[in-house]
Amino acid sequence: MTADIRVSIDRGGTFCDVIAHVEGREPIIFKLLSVDPANYQDAPTEGIRRVLEIVEGKKIPVGEKLDGTRIASCRLGTTVATNALLEGKYEKFALVTTKGFEDVCVIGDQSRPKLFDLKVKKAEALHDTVIGVDERVTIEDYDLNPYPLDKSASLNDPDLVRTPSGEIIRILARVNEETVREQLLALRDAGYNSVAISFMHSYIFPDHEDQVAKIAREVGFTYVTTSAETRPVLKYLNRSTSCCSEACLYPVIRRYIENFESGFRVLPRRVDFMCSDGGLKQSQKFRGNEALLSGPAGGVVGIATSCYDVEQKIPIIGFDMGGTSTDVSRFDGKYDYLSETVIADRTISMPMLNISTVAAGGGSILFARSGLLVVGPESAGAHPGPACYRKGGPLTVTDANLFLGRLVVSSFPSIFGENADQPLDQDVVTAKFQEITADFNSQTSQNLTAEEVALGFLDVANEAMSRPIRNTTEARGFAPEKHNLVSFGGAGGQHACAIASKLGIKRVLIHKWSSLLSAHGISQADLQYESFEPLSLDFGMDLNGFIKERLSLLREKVAAGLLAQGAQESTLRFDESLVMKYFGTDTTITVTTPDDLDYGAAFEALHLREFAFKLNRKIVIDSVNVRGTGSAVTLATEEPPLKALARVKSVATTAQTTEEQKVYINGSWRKVPIYRLDQLSKGCAVSGPAMIIDKTQTIFVEPRFNAYILPDHVILEESNVEDTVTRQAVSAEEINPLLLSVFAHRFMSIAEQMGNTLQRTSVSSSIKERLDFSCAIFSREGKLVANAPHIPIHLGSMQMAIRYQHEAWKGKLKPGDALVTNHPLSGGTHLPDLTVVSPVFVNGDVAFYVASRGHHTDIGGKGIAAMMPESKELWEEGISIKTMKIVSGGEFLEDEIRAAFDKAGSFPGCSPTRRIADNLSDLKAQIASNQRGIILLGNLCEEFTLPVVCTYMEGIQANAEFAVRRFLKQLAKKHPEPLTAIDYFDDGTPIKIKIIIDPETGGAVYDFSGTGPQQWGNYNCPISITHSAIIYTLRCLVDVDIPLNEGCLTPIDIRVPYGSMLNPSPAVAICGSTLASQRVIDTILRAFRRCAASQGCASSFSWGMGGRDPETGKVLPGWNYGESLGGGVGALPGYHGESAINVHSTNTRNTDPEVVEKRTAVLVTKYAVRKGSGGRGQWRGGDGVTREIQARIPLKFSILSDRRVYRPYGMEGGEAGHRGQNYVFKFNQEGTGFEQINLGGKAVVVLNPGEKMQINTPGGGAWGKPEGDADGYREEDQAGDGI
């Protein structure tokens, strides 16, 4: 029997899409429900059964085993892995880690996903249990070493090993096989069948993992996964998470494949699965992580193979709008890959196509909140679904389209309602829109119609879906208008024209199978195989022979892998590349082998294009890669779409129809023609407004667009003819409340893109990895308009810095200028936070300001790092600048900024910065970030005019004020009495607050009278810190997504006595202010009685060497490193506090343990949750963390922390969290062991090689009395006042 059927299936969350190609006949396409247990057990098997019925012309009973003899290939994309990860439905497994790192996946990167949610929740670790193995290796040298080792020297020490990467590692502890066998047998006896093994530095030294894996197989584990096998890349956390993901998903995938294949009595000749990287893998070789973006990857391949015109080469943007979310991708002739991506709040290291997702789709719920129209991110899902589904669902984007006439009810089957036999419900949608319109009119004192409000919601939804497109294009230096938009997914056609218009895109391509494009992409995909080898080599042209040899070996491996999967040898194609970076950075660039083999020049050219600068540093090769593709079948090709368009346009006929429907467009109802796609002749044209419908989608052709019907596509092009109904102009005289959310999205998008630029172009780990930065835009008066959700402590303080610069430089700035500042008197928080401010000129005048603030780890001064425990006066803490021009007319003033940094080292006992190259590079990155903001604000003014943009900036600020006043009025009705609270720093200094709310106006006085005087120390807080604390707590308390800007503080009268700790004089030290801000926030929240205290600290932990020698005065070469540590979150009713995470004003990430050891001369010996440190209560406080670091050479360590005396308070009878503890372990006099010494909250200590420092951060307070009130519980445990 001839095998003449090729089936491609994409099993999505709601629908399973099927495309079957059969020789000699038209393709078979249809959809069926992904889950329908009443009618079939497995959707893909059912899809194949239906295909065979159609082809063979005979009935095949459901459930009968299928004969796949005629099926030449079966290709599948599946959400099985993603669903298992999201729903936690996977086989339990055990994690085996290096001893001391058992909690690495529990802690994660310590940043919280939702900045203003007091009920902090991070993704749970995937493993069920964990054991630590007493094995250990580390890297012998370190990147920051001013006296680097000679890696080419011979190795005589048996504990030193030169790895294939070129890196030398030291074995500190070898695997004890007998002990490990006992540990694994205990796990096996406990019922575990799957184990994940992840050891420190196994990406370059996998020997210990392989050793333990061999034992695991010997003792009977069925599934054994190692991190080096999963993905051998630097970063222990991400590699461990990826290993765990593979360990839990691989059994799920194997079972799924076995179940699928069990539905056949004769299997198809080939069964291949779609991988996240856009390639196919044979079912026997398909793994868990490869399945995570299986369906979306099919969509990217679909747009690339069906909508990218290989002749005209215009790049395309994929716009895949579904029910709950929208996926965005880009293709310019080459696929864009990511080496890691976040799925289900977990970072997975695995090559995947670059796909951005936004929580906005057809099922996104519509809200009217505080005078704003809000779309999502909540979704109605499939159940209950939109209101029109007759299941009691909420109003959604789909309902707005139905209400405005943009959906044709008769084109939907009658499958809705309790008995699944009713049409879409228009009546309930009308009633709900009238209800939400009345509410919105009440909030805004308007008299809008329901149609105007519904159209406003669609505008907001379109803007929300445009944001990821802007981030995919503009943020990377690509102009959106230079692209074609490819719309697919069930809902994309309704919004495609509007999205294109917002982005300035003139052409939209919609494939004939756009609602099944992922399945179509799967049908067009190639087999893929990738192999790479990690390296750590300084690039030089003399390495070309070595590189060629490594690539040749990898190419042979890739070819063998493809041929083993059945690829035809003649179809094999290879992409060879090096992954390269500048020394001391983490920004890698993949460099395809250039014709002249000068990888270095190619890298620098790509870096310059991507980031707009070069660095005067050596270049490092991170890895060599070979990716191969091949095909097992010969595929039919379609005519290039733009070629077909050119052929049709000149002879296009006007389509005819007798159907029409009223549609609400730009302020009025209009009769709009309806066309059935299957009845339109190829080569005809449709003028908008119109609707084109088929079995699976609706295309709304907006006014000013023409649709051309081609053999394989519908192409929508914007015409130059104005519609007879004039488009609504945006007035600068009066604010349209329907547009406020649209402008809020645009302003936020600009701030986000600034942040993306800063992270991508920065060099230091503080900004690039730990994300200790913020970006924002400001009005011409220096008032905050919008900031991306970065670091909360910067929220209210940056506007004070911009206002200071505005007043200082009024009338003196010119285009191309930029300023830098960090002084507390000019709106600074603490000196390491350097703020770069740029004016935005429009029509020759300053129209706005943009600013970026980044934490610089070394700014000179007395300490080993910028966060020094011992400082008493400001001059000791490093560079301090009230205002200074850093760029003049586009010229970077490097000499002046170097002189400013050098000046910081001229004071007694002070050193200049040890990392001036990093300082300069990061300042240039901040300038680049601002430049991105300048360009985007200029574009916005061109689109809407300057007066309109300024008007809506004021409108957004007024809206934030309205939301805060509304909240405070409601609170005052419930609690008319003043709100008071007091808390204490560890030295006994009180923080006191009284909040008096005016119930009529919603204004409030925040009075800090009674707060203690400024101290001879560094916990003094510039007044800008208090502003930040207030704006942050207000946003948390309002608990809805309101714009964060100047308007939030307009109702607030802030009174802080001068000379107090919260409004100090300019002479005192302030570097601990950002840590002290945690205590200010805790005190404000205590006054509102909202939650128990969180850790109240952000333990700033630093180490390094070099700087000015106190005896000789000579400045020695050196380096420093530092990080902030998370702790416990305070509980509140209905919520146990989260553990081991950053709280409130801080949200930086931690530095990965492997990165710490690769860069600095230390060992991370322990990183764990400090179990039991959270307060006990009805609702428990979260636990803190323990971070222990050992010196490998003589080093200076410092710790700056609080809550080492006063415990984080509990509420309503809940126990206080445990106070933090800082220890050093110094060798005893005999040298036989360690003496444990308590350091207190602030200390500097020099450690010899082998000595350790351990930081134990505080837990969070509990809420409500512990059950039984036993076990020594005392009243003072609630207050947190006991020492």
Swiss-Prot record:
Residues 1266-1277 have a biased composition (Basic and acidic residues). It comes from the Eukaryota. The keyword Oxidoreductase does not apply. It catalyses: 5-oxo-L-proline + ATP + 2 H2O = L-glutamate + ADP + phosphate + H(+). GO terms for biological process: glutathione metabolic process; melanin biosynthetic process. InterPro entries: ACX-like_C, Hydant_A_N, Hydantoinase_A, Hydantoinase_B, Oxoprolinase-like. Disruption phenotype: Does not affect the production of scytalone. It is an enzyme of class 3 (hydrolase). Its EC number is 3.5.2.9. This is 5-oxoprolinase PfmaA. It comes from Pestalotiopsis fici (strain W106-1 / CGMCC3.15140).
